[in-house]
């Protein structure tokens, strides 16, 4: 198999699972069991990192009107279908709908925070200190063990209007460092999963860490230009 096929496989797996951490741990398990060679595993892991961005992109759109139809479709496929394959598809669709319903609930719960002085002070500090933002994102993802969840939380915070009721309480310049910290923090799951799994499993986890760390550090060094690129 070519590296490109490995990348596409990783992308597809993460698009279905909606969890880069789970997909990466699965790949590390395959490497440890000798079912997947290290070069191919690294290609799949790189695809996983690309695929996990799809969740954030979907969250950015207003898909709340589609949540209940998606939940109903998933429920119908899971319980009405006779073939296990379609039942699995139904479970995946239902889980996907639950993901967005949870994100919507999270957004409504965060709305009152926009008027809290302590919360506003913290957001001001994060905007003024990119390093603090990176550390915040890193610690959040290490605790939650899901970059998709912390990125969803970040997107909901970024949607909240500040005291003027117009501008974001966090802003893009404040959100990007937190996002970079999320990207670094998600590697901890893979590093924990490779413990006791052999050298190749450890190497696969290290490749995952190096990929995320190098990309995040490069974006952090070029932060002003990176923000302008995103705004463009």
Q: Model regions: which residues?
A:
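Membrane-interfacial helix-loop connectors
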Residues: 14-17, 25-53, 57-66, 77-78, ...
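Interfacial helix-loop-helix linkers and transmembrane-helix boundary segments
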Residues: 1, 82-90, 197-207
């Amino acid at each position: 198999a070519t590296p490109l096929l490995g990348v596409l496989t990783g992308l597809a797996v993460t698009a279905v699972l909606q969890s880069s951490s789970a997909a990466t741990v699965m790949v590390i398990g395959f490497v440890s069991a000798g079912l997947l060679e290290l070069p191919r595993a690294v290609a799949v892991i790189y695809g996983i990192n690309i695929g996990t961005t799809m969740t954030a992109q979907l969250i950015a759109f207003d898909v709340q009107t589609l949540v209940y139809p998606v939940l109903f479709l998933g429920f119908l496929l899971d319980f009405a279908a006779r073939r296990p394959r379609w039942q699995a598809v139904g479970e995946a669709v239902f889980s996907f709908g639950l993901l967005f319903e949870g994100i919507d609930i999270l957004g409504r719960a965060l709305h009152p925070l926009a008027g809290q002085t302590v919360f506003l002070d913290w957001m001001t500090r994060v905007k003024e200190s990119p390093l603090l933002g990176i550390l915040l994102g890193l610690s959040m993802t290490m605790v939650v063990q899901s970059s998709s969840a912390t990125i969803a939380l970040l997107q909901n915070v970024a949607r909240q209007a500040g005291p003027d009721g117009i501008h974001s309480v966090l802003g893009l310049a404040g959100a990007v460092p937190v996002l970079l910290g999320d990207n670094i923090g998600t590697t901890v799951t893979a590093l924990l999963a490779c413990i006791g799994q052999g050298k190749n499993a450890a190497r696969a986890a290290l490749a995952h860490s190096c990929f995320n760390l190098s990309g995040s550090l490069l974006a952090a060094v070029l932060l002003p230009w990176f923000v302008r690129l995103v705004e463009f």
